[in-house]
Structure formats: structure tokens, C-alpha cells
């Protein structure tokens, strides 16, 4: 009743991203007095992990004379709009008077890093890569070889090192270092400040330890995880458990620091390599898309029931001028 009295009109953008609880609240509010208007695109519903479902968007009923379809695409070239129309049948988008024909969409096949560099050169050094997962995005940042990438490495880390005290601190320091190199110092300190909770000034201790680690970055970034472990023990003075023969020692001896570093989730990522989910709502002049499901999407697109295909659609629709699609083979 209070919300109805305060807000006679409510407008909800990106309605396809609402979860069942949010939908329930809005439905209750609109039962009387308050007029609720929503805008969204079921083809861009990509947050099932938060409870969002295309069916929730479909279930928002309005009178026929209150439902409108926006067909004009003010962002992309005619070539990109043609691709967007080819993969969906529910609406037919069209450009506006200022829409240009644009360049052909390019399929790039082969090595992932070579593909990015080729597209980068074609665009004069202005290119945004959009990847399905954090690991791929971070690997591209570091020009990391695709054959060395393991998206399940964090799970293996937890399985191999059963010492929670040691493993949690090692991982926290890795996150802090990588966040720092993305200029997110506030979040970086949050990751390790808890480790120094017994200190008189935990924040000061965290800053001191992180500063030293960053100075020694070149000494461990291209080495194994065991070298990072020794660096932490030496610089911070933390008493971390040593290693006996077994799975933990084998993992630390054989896993490069960079392999774990690329698994760090950079929340406020403003780099040229981000995930598709982080690009939602944004737009870029030139885009290259990395997604393992891209081939199946191009051959048989299914935006109705396949969320992976909707994720790819979101990526394609971010591009203004040039679009590159990467296929491994």
C-alpha cells in the first residue's frame, strides 16, 4: 500500500532479467492503482543462475493496445542487423535513416590468441573481446595459450589441497594480486584483510603485504604455484603448512601461477577482455565473440529454450560497426 501511494507509475527496464520474487512483488503492486510498465527482450534472458526465466517475461500480461514492439535498431550496421534477424523469428529488426551498410561479419578460425590479434589489427587497435567465462577472458588478457587453460582448475585446486587454512589464503592472495593489476585496489584489500584480523591494524598489514607482493610479481608470475607459496611465506611472515609427498605437493609443483590467476573473477572489469554477462547493456564499435557453442548457434539457433544461444545473441548485439566470430576449427 505504501509503494502504491508513493509510486503511481513504475517503469522496469530489462524485465527479462527479473527473478520470481521480483516478479511476484511487481504483480502484487499492479493489482490496483499503480500502473506498471516494463520493457525487455526475452531473447536476452541470460540470468537463470539468479532465477530469471523467459517465461516470467511472457507471463506479464497487458491489453493488446498497451503492447508495443520496438523494431528499430539504432546501434548496429545493416550487416549485423541482418545476422540478428537471421537467428530469431519473433521480431524483424530494421535500421534507421543513419544506419550504414557496414563491413561483412568475419569468421576467424584457428588459434584463439592469433584470432584476436588478427581482428585487433583489422580494427586499428580498437576491439572488445566477449567470452563465455572468466577464465577465457582472463587468459586473453594475459595472452595465455589455449592449450594450457583449464576452466575446472579451481575445483582441482580444492580437491588437491585439503588444507583449508593454506588453500584459502593462497587463493585470497592470488585474487588480491590480480585485482590490483586491474586497478581494483579496494576489492583487492578486501580479499586479504581478513587474513590479518589478529593484527592491531589489519588494513595496514594487508596494504604492506600486497605492496610487497606486487613488487615481486615478476619473480613468481611465470613460475609454479609453489614459488608463489614461498613468496607469500617470505614476504608476509604467515606460517602456512609445508608439503609432504602427495596430491597437494604435486598440484603446487606442476600448476603455473598464471593458470590459477586467470580464474579470478574481476567484477568491475573495464578491460578489452570481459565476459558476455558483464557486457550486458553496453555497446562497442568492434567485437569479437568467443563461445564454444557458437557453431551450434550458427547452424541451428534456438533462442526460445537454449540459454547458451541467448548468451551468444547478447554478445552479437553489442557490436556497432564490426563483428568477428571465433571458431576453433
Question: Model-predicted segments: where are they?
Answer:
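The feature marks helicase ATPase cores and/or their adjacent C-terminal helical subdomains
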Residues: 1-329
Amino acid at each position: 500500500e505504501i509503494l502504491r501511494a508513493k509510486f503511481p507509475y513504475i517503469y522496469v527496464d530489462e524485465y527479462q532479467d527479473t527473478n520470481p520474487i521480483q516478479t511476484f512483488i511487481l504483480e502484487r503492486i499492479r493489482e490496483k492503482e499503480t500502473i506498471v510498465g516494463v520493457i525487455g527482450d526475452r531473447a536476452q534472458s541470460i540470468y537463470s543462475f539468479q532465477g530469471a526465466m523467459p517465461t516470467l517475461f511472457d507471463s506479464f500480461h497487458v491489453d493488446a493496445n498497451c503492447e508495443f514492439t520496438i523494431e528499430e535498431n539504432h546501434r548496429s550496421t545493416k550487416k549485423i542487423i541482418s545476422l540478428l534477424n537471421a537467428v530469431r523469428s519473433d521480431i524483424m529488426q530494421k535500421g534507421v535513416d543513419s544506419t550504414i551498410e557496414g563491413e561483412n561479419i568475419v569468421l576467424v578460425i584457428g588459434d584463439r590468441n592469433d584470432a584476436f590479434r588478427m581482428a585487433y589489427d583489422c580494427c586499428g587497435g580498437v576491439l572488445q573481446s566477449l567470452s563465455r567465462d572468466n577464465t577465457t577472458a582472463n587468459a586473453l588478457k594475459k595472452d595465455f595459450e589455449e592449450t594450457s587453460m583449464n576452466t575446472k582448475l579451481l575445483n582441482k585446486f580444492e580437491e588437491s589441497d585439503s588444507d583449508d587454512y593454506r588453500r584459502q589464503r593462497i587463493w585470497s592472495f592470488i585474487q588480491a594480486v590480480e585485482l590490483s593489476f586491474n586497478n581494483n585496489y579496494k576489492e583487492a584489500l578486501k580479499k586479504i584483510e581478513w587474513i590479518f584480523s589478529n593484527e592491531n591494524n589489519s588494513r595496514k598489514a594487508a596494504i604492506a603485504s600486497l605492496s610487497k607482493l606486487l613488487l615481486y610479481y615478476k619473480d613468481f608470475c611465470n613460475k609454479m604455484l609453489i614459488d608463489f607459496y614461498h613468496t607469500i611465506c617470505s614476504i608476509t611472515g604467515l606460517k602456512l603448512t609445508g608439503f609432504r609427498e602427495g596430491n597437494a605437493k604435486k598440484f603446487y609443483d606442476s600448476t603455473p601461477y598464471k593458470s590459477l590467476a586467470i580464474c579470478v573473477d574481476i567484477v568491475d572489469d573495464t578491460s578489452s577482455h570481459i565476459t558476455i554477462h558483464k557486457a550486458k547493456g553496453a555497446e562497442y564499435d568492434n567485437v569479437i565473440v568467443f563461445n564454444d557453442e557458437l557453431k551450434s548457434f550458427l547452424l541451428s539457433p534456438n533462442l526460445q529454450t537454449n540459454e547458451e544461444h541467448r548468451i551468444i545473441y547478447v554478445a552479437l548485439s553489442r557490436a556497432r560497426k564490426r563483428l568477428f566470430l571465433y571458431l576453433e576449427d
